[in-house]
Amino acid sequence: MKKVVKYLISLILAIIIVLFVQTFVIVGHVIPNNDMSPTLNKGDRVIVNKIKVTFNQLNNGDIITYRRGNEIYTSRIIAKPGQSMAFRQGQLYRDDRPVDASYAKNRKIKDFSLRNFKKLDGDIIPPNNFVVLNDHDNNQHDSRQFGLIDKKDIIGNISLRYYPFSKWTIQFKS
């Protein structure tokens, strides 16, 4: 009888730990489409880290998952609160300086800036808002369609791709 009680206590404790980790630390996610191709492809399995959101540690270039209505999307942060942003002739400019990162150059995006967003006064991203963009230019399930992404809608940043095994990635390069 004591073994059964010990087993049940261990099982309940394990369930509580798993629920805590999935609620506050990390969660698994399957990439549902090719919005972030070639960086992430449909069917890739990733770990989403919730800690960077909780402690305001999101950076430009981070790949995040976020909610929009009942859907979950994956995009890259290209501008954070307090920054300005514009695309001119396929090049990303942040705070009026060209961004030297692979995701920011030679894009098929013509002209796009914060002035395209409705409900935004000025050229500076307000607190707790982000501009996100997909790596795949033709898919506009990002700030071009949704506008600013509120921090409260961000689930976390993708910190690990564990499947397919041949594409194991711990840290995504900008």
Curated annotation (Swiss-Prot):
Give membrane topology per the record. Answer: Single-pass type II membrane protein
- InterPro entries given for it? LexA/Signal_pep-like_sf, Pept_S26A_signal_pept_1, Peptidase_S26
A single GO BP annotation from the record?
signal peptide processing
- List localization entries: Cell membrane
Q: Which domain of life is it from?
A: Bacteria
- Kindly give the PANTHER family that the UniProt entry links to this protein: CHLOROPLAST PROCESSING PEPTIDASE, SIGNAL PEPTIDASE I
**Record keywords, A-Z:** Cell membrane, Membrane, Transmembrane, Transmembrane helix
Has UniProt tagged this entry with the keyword Secreted? no
Species, as recorded: Staphylococcus aureus (strain MRSA252)
Q: Which GO terms describe its cellular component?
A: plasma membrane
* Cited function: Catalytically inactive.
Q: Which family does the record claim for this protein?
A: Belongs to the peptidase S26 family.
| Tagged with keyword Cell membrane | yes
For this protein, what is any one GO molecular function term? Answer: serine-type endopeptidase activity
The residues exposed to the Extracellular compartment are 29-174
**What name does UniProt use for this protein?**
Inactive signal peptidase IA
Instruction: Provide the membrane-side ranges marked Cytoplasmic in the record.
Output: 1-7
- Matches recorded under NCBIfam families: sigpep_I_bact (TIGR02227)
Any stretches that span the bilayer, and where are they? Answer: 8-28
Entry-linked Pfam families: Peptidase_S26
